[in-house]
Design a protein with these regions (language model features):
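Hydrophobic faces of well-ordered beta-strands that scaffold small-molecule active sites
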Residues: 52-55, 84-86, 135-138, 211-213, ...
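Active-site-proximal substrate-binding groove within the catalytic cores of carbohydrate-active enzymes
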Residues: 254, 268-270, 284-410
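Short, acidic/polar
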Residues: 61-78, 191-205, 257-265, 324-332
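An acidic-aromatic substrate-binding cleft motif
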Residues: 34-92
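Active-site neighborhood of glycoside hydrolase catalytic domains
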Residues: 184-303
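Aromatic- and acidic-residue-enriched carbohydrate-binding clefts of CAZyme catalytic domains
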Residues: 90-121, 149-188, 217-234
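Beta-strand-enriched, solvent-exposed domains that form extended recognition/catalytic surfaces
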Residues: 1-46
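Active-site-adjacent "subsite" loops/lids of carbohydrate-active enzymes
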Residues: 45-66, 135-206
Length: 410
């Protein structure tokens, strides 16, 4: 189709959930085509059919500067990111909104005592919506800070490390942070009603599209207030059901940390795709294939998989610098070829489970490669990620012993 001037208009075919690759080229006098550029197009009525998930994690005064948010989101848009997770945006885990339903705080502190500006959160949401992205707020399914009793959280809702009610289960944090996080029973219906109402306060004031639910993996034996052993995976399913019942029009995604509770999460039929945070015991490329195959069964062949796989994790924990470009690209090539997606792009590139960490940066080569890789994943999504497109082939590689042990931390 010929373009006139510097613009080009195209009406997509009516077929839903289809990826396309657009080539922009000119033809020389001898008939040779010269490619000027390429870009992918995703024609889908629902973003969760082929989720390409990003994140934002800093909401301080630096984001109020004109053009900062727009530039960040323009890059995500160019990479076809269609959903964005808001990490560490909340005031308290048991009271996520900064302020009250009736009166929002202009600025409040997150769990690490960083400043969060409500206007920045709102601007991220509105900018994402203007680009066709969806905005998902993050929170644990069972977290409360040390002042929770003053906000109406009851002692009977917690889980404990023993049957004596003396030692609440907790996720301990640095002393400079706001509080440790104390864990509640996700099955407890009173807690479910409480946090669902807090979420209602959020939705009433901030135009989020859904809830990115988190957990903390296998905690070992834990007990409720009455001394009964708690079945956390069953509790996660119950929690998801309760959140969907309270807000049926909002999207839900839940993290399966090291695949813990994955089958129960998927089995609810209430999450929109599957999300796996992978750790050292499942950080090989073969493990990713195993997870995707399992998720496909858990989700009845209907739910896609997004991996939270932190690149150059060890390096980011001990130094600063740049990402290992070949390692990132090889990992993405594997994940995309397996039919998954990689949570990695946001207001920076992700390297640690603490999303605000900016220890490592993308160089220009990696930034350019990200655009090309995400173009490819989007354009060929029907081959890579659609139903019944898996093919088994035999591959033989000659490589060094070191290369045989490639992992996500490459």
């Amino acid at each position: 189709q010929a373009a006139v001037g510097t613009t080009w208009t195209w009406t997509a075919p009516a077929t839903d959930y289809t990826g396309y690759l657009v080539d922009v080229y000119r033809t020389k006098e001898n008939g040779t085509e010269v490619i000027l550029g390429t870009i992918a197009v995703d024609v889908s009525s629902d973003w969760t059919r082929f989720p390409r998930y990003g994140f934002v994690a800093t909401f301080d005064a630096s984001k109020k500067v004109d053009g900062v948010i727009e530039k960040e989101m323009a890059f995500l848009n160019r990479c076809h990111i269609n959903g964005v997770q808001f990490q560490d945006w909340h005031n308290k885990h048991h009271w996520p909104l900064g302020g009250t339903r009736e009166h929002l705080d202009e600025v409040y502190k997150d769990i690490a005592n960083r400043e969060v500006y409500t206007e920045v959160v709102k601007k991220y949401i509105s900018t994402q919506h203007s680009l066709g992205m969806k905005s998902m707020f993050y929170n644990l399914c069972f977290g409360a800070l040390d002042d929770a009793v003053s906000d109406g959280v009851k002692e009977e809702w917690y889980i404990f490390k023993n049957t004596g009610r003396m030692d609440k289960d907790s996720h301990d944090l640095p002393s400079s942070w706001k509080s440790n996080i104390f864990l509640l029973n996700p099955t407890n219906t009173e807690w479910q009603a409480y946090i669902a109402q807090r979420n209602d306060d959020v939705y009433a004031n901030l135009d989020f599209d859904g809830y990115q639910i988190d957990q903390l993996g296998n905690r070992g034996d834990r007990y409720d207030y009455d001394g009964n052993k708690v079945n956390l995976p069953k509790g996660y399913a119950s929690f998801i059901e309760a959140m969907k019942q309270k807000h049926p029009d909002k999207r839900l995604v839940m993290n399966a940390v090291s695949s813990y509770g994955a089958s129960q999460i998927a089995g609810t039929g209430k999450v929109d795709f599957l999300y796996n945070e992978v750790w050292g015991d499942e950080a090989g490329f073969k493990d990713l294939h195993t997870i995707i195959k399992a998720n496909d069964q858990y989700g009845n062949h209907a739910l896609k998989t997004v991996f939270a796989a932190y690149m150059n994790y060890d390096k980011a924990g001990s130094s600063t610098g740049e990402f290992n470009t070949p390692g990132v690209l090889l990992t993405d090539a594997v994940i995309f070829a397996l039919g998954g997606s990689h949570l990695e792009l946001g207001d920076h590139m992700l390297c640690r489970e603490y999303f605000p960490s900016t220890a490592l940066q993308m160089n220009d080569v990696l930034k350019t490669a990200m655009i090309r890789y995400y173009d490819f994943m989007t354009a060929y999504q029907n081959l890579l990620r659609d139903k019944d497109t898996e093919a088994e082939i035999s591959v033989s590689l000659n490589c060094t012993d070191a290369a045989r042990n490639l992992s996500l931390n490459a």
